[in-house]
Amino acid sequence: MRNIYLVGFMGSGKSTVGKLLAEKLGFRFVDIDQEIEKEEGKKIKDIFREKGESYFRDLEKRMIERFLGSKNLVVSTGGGLGADSENMRKMKENGTVIWLDTPLETVFERCKGDDERPLLKKNRKEIKELFEKRKKIYAQADIRISTEGKSPYQIVNEILGRIR
């Protein structure tokens, strides 16, 4: 079966849903952020601080390309990875892209107090602008799943119903 790529803003549940979905499908789960941390030997926030966002975005692109030729993967992308048109095109060519659409207020609630997310250092207005900009690219996904008011298990079951 083709790969499944989960896209969405930070805090949308990509990693949580991805692990559960991979388990249900018998697929391997890949978290791009974790793969980057493993390769760099540093936390994402430290990569951002030391080398900047554009360096990190290049790492994301290289990392996703590593998995494009594989099969039977559920891939949790970083929030910015799926917000790049070129990355979106490549993922769609290689698999099914699923957007976990989560309202911004829910994202704020889930992420408050999380100092591991460098983009939360921005003010609310900047985050809202980034959120709106990224939504336009996330909307190119093959499948949109609203996560509002749903448990990770409900989201996984909805995905399974849509991909089978």
Swiss-Prot record:
GO terms for cellular component: cytosol. The keyword Cell division does not apply. Monomer. This is Shikimate kinase. HAMAP family: Shikimate_kinase (MF_00109). Keywords: Amino-acid biosynthesis, Aromatic amino acid biosynthesis, ATP-binding, Cytoplasm, Kinase, Magnesium, Metal-binding, Nucleotide-binding, Transferase. It comes from Persephonella marina (strain DSM 14350 / EX-H1). Pathway: Metabolic intermediate biosynthesis; chorismate biosynthesis; chorismate from D-erythrose 4-phosphate and phosphoenolpyruvate: step 5/7. It comes from the Bacteria. Its main location: cytoplasm. GO terms for molecular function: ATP binding; magnesium ion binding; shikimate kinase activity. Catalyzes the specific phosphorylation of the 3-hydroxyl group of shikimic acid using ATP as a cosubstrate. It holds the Pfam family SKI. The keyword rRNA processing does not apply. GO terms for biological process: amino acid biosynthetic process; aromatic amino acid family biosynthetic process; chorismate biosynthetic process. ATP binds at residues 11-16, 117. Its EC number is 2.7.1.71. Substrate binds at residues 33, 57, 79, 134. It is found in: Cytoplasm. The gene is aroK. Mg(2+) binds at residue 15. It catalyses: shikimate + ATP = 3-phosphoshikimate + ADP + H(+). Its cofactor is Mg(2+). Belongs to the shikimate kinase family. Binds 1 Mg(2+) ion per subunit. It is an enzyme of class 2 (transferase).
